[in-house]
Amino acid sequence: MEDDSLYLGGEWQFNHFSKLTSSRPDAAFAEIQRTSLPEKSPLSSEARVDLCDDLAPVARQLAPRKKLPLSSRRPAAVGAGLQNMGNTCYENASLQCLTYTPPLANYMLSREHSQTCQRPKCCMLCTMQAHITWALHSPGHVIQPSQALAAGFHRGKQEDAHEFLMFTVDAMKKACLPGHKQVDHHSKDTTLIHQIFGGCWRSQIKCLHCHGISDTFDPYLDIALDIQAAQSVKQALEQLVKPEELNGENAYHCGLCLQRAPASKTLTLHTSAKVLILVLKRFSDVTGNKLAKNVQYPECLDMQPYMSQQNTGPLVYVLYAVLVHAGWSCHDGHYFSYVKAQEGQWYKMDDAKVTACSITSVLSQQAYVLFYIQKSEWERHSESVSRGREPRALGAEDTDRRATQGELKRDHPCLQAPELDERLVERATQESTLDHWKFPQEQNKTKPEFNVRKVEGTLPPNVLVIHQSKYKCGMKNHHPEQQSSLLNLSSTTRTDQESVNTGTLASLQGRTRRSKGKNKHSKRALLVCQ
């Protein structure tokens, strides 16, 4: 259920009009085809997970990690809005947060996966690559997400955005693994997705009888925060890592002294992810009712106090996306998101509507999912974008789309989609002064191949004259060639700068010397493009 009355204010309109296109990423890939792709990074033997000495055997089983590419082709500005296909706001809000995740977006723009993907059918990584590339290279447009993104999840009703988010992340993680079913457990923790979103919990139990210590390490892709008694994300994190006393019926059975003894259990972050997904537990597991309370969250978050190793410096994260639910239950309401473009401007992504907003508006929401990225990672990717090439000229994607379509269809089955509807792409127009208009006319006047009386050069071939000009009063119906001659004569003052775009209405306003000052109230010619 989409409730427009629940929308929050504080933003100003960014796009004055939306351009709806079909689900085809050709225009986005056209730009990538015209530029050289970054070389694949060599395999790195460095393990970013700082494992303890007792975990050295496990570390040797981990697959070598690939360095995530830094793409110089990622646009700095905001991309497209997403069309709501009916109770799909949860999908749109989640996809926008993933689209503006810098490490994931840059990897997708490199097309590294689709060039080596061996899966006979569509995989989530290939599908997400097409979506992210297309969305980031379609500013001012409204695009329709591929149905393959929610295949097996969407059932035609409102779903939980966090569940869909983790469904997509898990599907991308599985797409990174080999095709065979038997995969080593530790190999799952070295995939591209785990490099971006993954970290490691450290659960430490200390026996208060023999002072023995037992450590358990578990991977994670997101962190759920209990906000029942917390007024801020910082308080929720402090409660999460607060030591827990195990005694009485919950006494710990120590493996060293072989006794049931009181113990202390502490949960900390052993390694923190590049991208941190914090989920505020707002919905009841039983009833689905929402805990509608304001929980403060900062623009910059220091995660060092919650790490197992306290001897290092600050570990600062910056906020780049917020997923919001407006409503009273997980079964209804409306989802939208806020994202931070690489240029630093925040935008509200509400299905097809894209509006610029302030950081004050972003921090005042009843957030459901928070997306943080390490400050060093954000600065590294921002520097990469700032060194990128200059923006393309308007309309360049339309020129090269047809030339690249054949090559795109050979890349991977997931990248194939219906054709773009050319009628829905608007052309840019440029204003011109009278002096600017006269100058090219004088330059072109001496060229013999240019015929100013030839109307075909300035009017589209599918023009139908509804109202004839004022010269028709002196004609007879059996002289069509005379009508055509006068129509050509009336077009002498029109130039290519005033050519009529397909799908618009135009009127011939030029007058010949013979009719100057006469018949001021006669009808002008009205043209319709079919």
Curated annotation (Swiss-Prot):
Catalytic reactions on record: Thiol-dependent hydrolysis of ester, thioester, amide, peptide and isopeptide bonds formed by the C-terminal Gly of ubiquitin (a 76-residue protein attached to proteins as an intracellular targeting signal)
Pfam name, any one: UCH
Active site: C89, H334
Disordered: annotated span: 382-416, 490-530
GO BP term, example: protein K48-linked deubiquitination
Any one Gene Ontology molecular-function term assigned to this protein's record: cysteine-type deubiquitinase activity
Basic residues: bias regions: 511-524
Listed Basic and acidic residues bias regions: 382-392, 398-413
Cellular compartments annotated: Nucleus; Endoplasmic reticulum
Further details from the record: Overexpressed in a subset of human breast cancers, overexpression leading to an abnormally high level of CDC25A, which arrests cells through replication stress or premature mitosis, the latter occurring when CDK1 is activated inappropriately.
Similarity remark: Belongs to the peptidase C19 family. USP17 subfamily.
Protein name: Ubiquitin carboxyl-terminal hydrolase 17
